[in-house]
Design a protein with these regions (language model features):
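Charge-dense, helix-prone N-terminal extensions
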Residues: 1-141
Length: 141
């Protein structure tokens, strides 16, 4: 199945209002990254076992692991989880960056080393979320 089709199906599989909000965030990210590589990870390992939430990815960077190996990965991830929605901002070396920069201003959200999780778009300052995404778009690798 084509990635764009998988993404549409992933969004459509969500109950309302999560579905509409996930679509709104997908549109927002694509507007910010119009020609980016798109990804879809179904959350299953090689044995078909569900190990993570299905994730839509945008953009790319080279991820370097502790053993020195590298892998291409998405810069921005969007997913639905039991708590609501999450935007993952990948490849940030400083694990406190998101917390320190956006934790106090984004609104009612849990901000971690690479993720911003919130129940609803209405609970957060969307301009601050856009700023966090834009910061990662502009950062090399």
């Amino acid at each position: 199945m084509e990635i764009k089709t998988q993404i549409k199906e992933c969004i459509k599989s969500q109950p309302e209002p999560k579905q509409s909000e996930m679509q709104e965030l997908d549109n927002l990210i694509l507007k910010m990254m119009p020609n980016c590589k798109q990804w879809y990870f179904d959350g299953k390992n090689e044995d078909g076992k569900q190990v993570a939430h299905p994730t839509i990815g945008y953009g790319n960077y080279i991820r370097t692991y502790k053993d020195g190996s590298t892998r291409e990965f998405f810069r921005i991830g969007l997913l639905a989880n039991p708590a609501g929605l999450a935007v993952h901002i990948m490849g940030i070396d400083d694990k406190k960056f998101l917390i320190d920069r956006y934790g106090k201003t984004i609104g009612k959200a849990k901000v971690g080393s690479y993720g911003i999780t919130f129940k609803s778009i209405k609970d957060i300052n969307l301009e601050i979320l856009k700023e966090a995404i834009q910061n990662r778009i502009e950062t090399r690798n």
